[in-house]
Curated annotation (Swiss-Prot):
Protein name as catalogued: Non-histone chromosomal protein 6
Keywords associated with the record: Chromosome, DNA damage, DNA repair, DNA-binding, Nucleus, Transcription, Transcription regulation
DNA-binding residues (ranges): 28-96
Known partners and oligomeric status: Weakly associates with the stable SPT16-POB3 heterodimer to form the FACT complex.
Family per record: Belongs to the NHP6 family.
GO cellular component: chromosome; nucleus
CDD domains, per database record: HMG-box_NHP6-like
Length: 99
């Protein structure tokens, strides 16, 4: 039995590529989440406790630790995230006024 012709044209070869807009270096930084503040705070401790763990494994350990935490334990990180969100919104408003 002969195989059917499976050759198809790639849609990417016929479509025009769009260029990604360059990011303004003066644009304000996005706010960090509570988990990201936790991750920054705990990453070295987790790496020291698990020296054989790679980058992905450390991330999984941090995620598991974050899920185990109570809301009271997460509160300092949530407060940091709220402050950072307010900072980012203020910087964005000032940035948009300049533009």
């Amino acid at each position: 039995m002969a195989k059917a012709d499976t050759k198809t044209k790639s849609s990417t070869s016929t479509q025009k590529r769009t260029t990604k807009a360059k990011k303004d270096p003066d644009a304000p930084k996005r706010p960090l989440s509570a988990y990201m503040f936790f991750s920054q705070d705990q990453r070295e401790r987790v790496k020291n406790a698990n020296p054989e763990a790679g980058f992905g494994e450390v991330g999984r350990l941090l995620g598991a630790k974050w899920k185990e935490m109570s809301e009271a334990e997460k509160k300092p990180y949530n407060d940091m995230a709220n402050r950072d969100k307010a900072r980012a919104e203020a910087e964005k408003a000032a940035y948009n006024k300049r533009r």
